[in-house]
Amino acid sequence: MSQAAETLDGWYSLHLFYAVDWASLRIVPKDERDALVTEFQSFLENTATVRSSKSGDQAIYNITGQKADLLLWFLRPEMKSLNHIENEFNKLRIADFLIPTYSYVSVIELSNYLAGKSDEDPYENPHIKARLYPELPHSDYICFYPMNKRRNETYNWYMLTMEERQKLMYDHGMIGRKYAGKIKQFITGSVGFDDFEWGVTLFSDDVLQFKKIVYEMRFDETTARYGEFGSFFVGHIINTNEFDQFFAIS
């Protein structure tokens, strides 16, 4: 049996995608609609307080295209905290006008493919801790997609030796390093949590960088032979103080 890669796991992750039911929202009187939005703003401002205590983080983006209108991404130390957030969100009046279109449950993950040998406790390493328990950037754009490593009769990632996988992941990682300073990447593991094995969340102030890195990696052997991808979601950042304009209906 091939050796399994060991992982370091950080904050639990929940991506929630919603489409706005504009037809139903349109017939709500303006004063009631304003109250819905204010309640939603207060909820998100309250959940965002974890950032100052370094016990979680969150991001809100307006998704481009018809797959969704809003992405809410929450990071928390425990899975049950994500359940609490989602349950409380569903009780908001605005939730009656937001249609769930997709969700993804995972956990921030680092693998040992490229790690050197050390007796150090990795969870005490400041660099590793910053990646496992990150402060999310306020970049203009976000890109999220789920993915698997292929396993069929011709190409099976899980039948490769650890050395073969390490070599492939090294080459794969060298492409990613070319985009340092242009893209911030977060990998979340989801084996046993969701329908794919990993989620990839990218941040950038230049949306074109998403196309460039994904295209370039198509020529990398790790992706070309072993990568399988779900739907891609791209969007622009939206702050809670912009909700009045976002939900405004003239």
UniProtKB/Swiss-Prot annotation:
Protein name (database record): Coproheme decarboxylase
Enzyme Commission code(s) on record: 1.3.98.5
Knocked-out gene: effects: Deletion mutant forms slow growing small colonies under aerobic but not anaerobic conditions. Mutant accumulates coproporphyrin specifically under aerobic conditions and shows deficiencies in catalase activity and peroxide resistance.
Subunit comment: Homohexamer.
Family annotation (Gene3D superfamilies): Apc35880, domain 1 (3.30.70.1030)
The protein's enzyme class: oxidoreductase
Taxonomic source organism: Staphylococcus aureus (strain Newman)
Cofactor: how and how many bound: Fe-coproporphyrin III acts both as a substrate and redox cofactor. Was originally thought to use heme as a cofactor.
InterPro entries (alphabetical): CHDC, ChdC/CLD, Dimeric_a/b-barrel
Keywords for the protein's UniProt record, in alphabetical order: Heme, Heme biosynthesis, Iron, Metal-binding, Oxidoreductase
Recorded GO MF terms: heme binding; metal ion binding; oxidoreductase activity, acting on the CH-CH group of donors, oxygen as acceptor; peroxidase activity
Database matches in NCBIfam families: PRK12276.1
Active site: 145
Record: residues binding Fe-coproporphyrin III: 131, 145-149, 172, 185
GO biological process: heme B biosynthetic process
